[in-house]
């Protein structure tokens, strides 16, 4: 196979490559065996037409397209490897010549990975907004959250105040006409929770059990039900019960109810302080790492980032997002209806982050190359075992899912990130 590359513009060019007859002939045989199963011809059983008869009747050229589909992937990848090109995005393939008995000649318009001119990426000094310090107020707030989780709702006779829960029936109408979804029975609503549209909950403050309250509200302009958006509505609301939140005493017994491993409130607070310190330390390290990587990317120059790279990353990101929505039972149509957005809007929302990720990956890859990082067999094996432990999967299953090249790439990328972050300091 002969190959050549002609540079057309920055990060763009055309590969010309040939496919030899020793590759074409087996591909033609495979193509014939694939289509002959459906062939009918006088004097032959279905699927048993001899090759010479086929060639005479239809011509060998009929097989060329199928044969090309068979032989092209390996031929193209071989040409890219021989030319040592770092290609991104899908190529545009054109046939130059496909003559019988001759080698085939093709071209591939390709986009290549851009050059990265690295700036400073070691000993960086960065702004880090996160703090490692844990205050008494943060510890007390965590205890208070757990205390509130153990609160009980107790029926009271007094008027409802914000934070109380009311059990209500309601019937909604617009211009005197009831609408779908505007009716509820024995609904528990915490006042101040923001569960209902703005203005609804506030009008139930002061109500008592047995009261009927006429709640007047206006649906937001961006309300998901377009036929109700911006319209004034009336909800006739009957209050059946008012319940107050009763929290337990803040003492050692509460501490033991929250965590059976402690005996006193002081022990619980000490445990929470240690947990918060570990959490804030991790958050600080993440913030330092993120800021250092961001500065290393800013310090580098990427020579004409191909739009195809960002476009592909946007598609990958959107597909991943929609897959996560579908796992939650939300179809694409349902998502766009609920959010009032379109496929185009979603792509635009992902563009900035996609652009940032592509640039970041390019710079980290360039650092790994500049540092001469490689991945040893032992490091690959450790990575497989670590992933198996992290995701509770058999080692062999992880090995079958991830190629050696993917694992090597991940390992050298981690090494490059470590080079950036290990010497970075906060201002």
UniProtKB/Swiss-Prot annotation:
Q: Does the keyword Glycoprotein apply?
A: no
| Catalysed reactions, semicolon-separated | [protein]-peptidylproline (omega=180) = [protein]-peptidylproline (omega=0)
The family database entries (InterPro entries) matched by this protein are listed as: PPIase_dom_sf, PPIase_FKBP_dom, Trig_fac, Trigger_fac_C, Trigger_fac_C_sf, Trigger_fac_ribosome-bd_bac, Trigger_fac_ribosome-bd_sf, Trigger_fact/SurA_dom_sf
Q: Which GO terms describe its molecular function?
A: peptidyl-prolyl cis-trans isomerase activity; protein folding chaperone; ribosome binding
Task: Report if keyword Ribonucleoprotein is assigned.
Answer: no
Localisation per UniProt entry: Cytoplasm
A GO term (biological process) for this protein? Answer: 'de novo' cotranslational protein folding
Report keywords, A-Z: Cell cycle, Cell division, Chaperone, Cytoplasm, Isomerase, Rotamase
Pfam families per UniProt? FKBP_C, Trigger_C, Trigger_N
GO cellular-component term (any): cytoplasm
Q: Taking every annotated instance into account, which residue ranges of this chain make up the domain PPIase FKBP-type? A: 163-248
Enzyme Commission designation: 5.2.1.8
Which NCBIfam families does this one have? Answer: tig (TIGR00115)
Family of the protein in this entry: Belongs to the FKBP-type PPIase family. Tig subfamily.
Query: What does the domain comment read?
Result: Consists of 3 domains; the N-terminus binds the ribosome, the middle domain has PPIase activity, while the C-terminus has intrinsic chaperone activity on its own.
Q: What does this protein do?
A: Involved in protein export. Acts as a chaperone by maintaining the newly synthesized protein in an open conformation. Functions as a peptidyl-prolyl cis-trans isomerase.
Q: Which HAMAP family does this one have?
A: Trigger_factor_Tig
Record-given protein name: Trigger factor
Q: Organism classification, top ranks?
A: Bacteria, Bacillati, Bacillota, Bacilli, Lactobacillales
Its gene name is tig
């Amino acid at each position: 196979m002969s190959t050549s590359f002609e540079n057309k513009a920055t990060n763009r060019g055309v590969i010309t490559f040939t496919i030899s007859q020793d590759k074409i002939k087996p591909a033609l045989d495979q193509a014939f065996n694939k289509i002959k199963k459906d062939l009918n011809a006088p004097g032959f059983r279905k699927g048993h037409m001899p090759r010479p008869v086929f060639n005479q009747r239809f011509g060998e050229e009929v097989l060329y397209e199928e044969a090309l589909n068979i032989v092209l992937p390996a031929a193209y990848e071989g040409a890219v490897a021989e030319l040592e090109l770092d290609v991104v995005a899908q190529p545009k393939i054109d046939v130059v010549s496909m003559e019988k008995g001759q080698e085939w000649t093709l071209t591939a318009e390709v986009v290549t990975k851009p050059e990265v001119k690295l700036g400073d990426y070691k000993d960086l000094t960065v702004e880090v907004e996160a703090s490692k310090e844990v205050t008494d107020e943060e510890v007390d707030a965590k205890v208070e959250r757990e205390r509130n989780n153990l609160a009980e709702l107790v029926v009271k006779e007094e008027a409802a105040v914000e934070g109380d829960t009311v059990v209500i029936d309601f019937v909604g109408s617009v211009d005197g006409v009831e609408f779908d979804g505007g009716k509820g029975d024995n609904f528990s609503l915490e006042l101040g929770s923001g569960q209902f549209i703005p203005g609804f909950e506030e009008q139930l403050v002061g109500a008592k059990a047995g009261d009927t309250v006429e709640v007047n509200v206006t649906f937001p302009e961006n309300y998901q039900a377009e036929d109700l958006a911006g319209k004034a509505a009336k909800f006739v609301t009957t209050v059946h019960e008012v319940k107050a939140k009763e929290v337990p005493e803040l003492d050692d017994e509460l501490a033991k109810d929250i965590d059976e491993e402690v005996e006193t409130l002081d022990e619980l607070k000490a445990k929470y302080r240690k947990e918060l310190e570990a959490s804030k330390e991790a958050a600080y390290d993440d913030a330092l790492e993120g800021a250092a990587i961001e500065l290393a990317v800013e310090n580098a120059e990427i020579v004409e980032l191909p739009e195809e790279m960002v476009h592909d990353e946007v598609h990958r990101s959107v597909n991943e997002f929609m897959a996560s929505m579908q796992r939650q039972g939300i179809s694409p149509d349902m998502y766009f209806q609920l959010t009032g957005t379109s496929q185009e809007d979603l792509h635009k929302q992902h563009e900035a982050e996609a652009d940032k990720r592509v640039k970041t990956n390019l710079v980290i890859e360039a650092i790994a190359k500049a540092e001469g990082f490689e991945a040893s067999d032992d490091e690959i094996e450790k990575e497989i075992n670590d992933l198996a432990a992290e995701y509770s999967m058999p080692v062999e299953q992880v090995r079958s899912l991830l190629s050696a090249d993917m694992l090597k790439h991940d390992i050298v990328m981690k090494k490059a990130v470590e080079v950036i972050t290990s010497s970075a300091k906060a201002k």
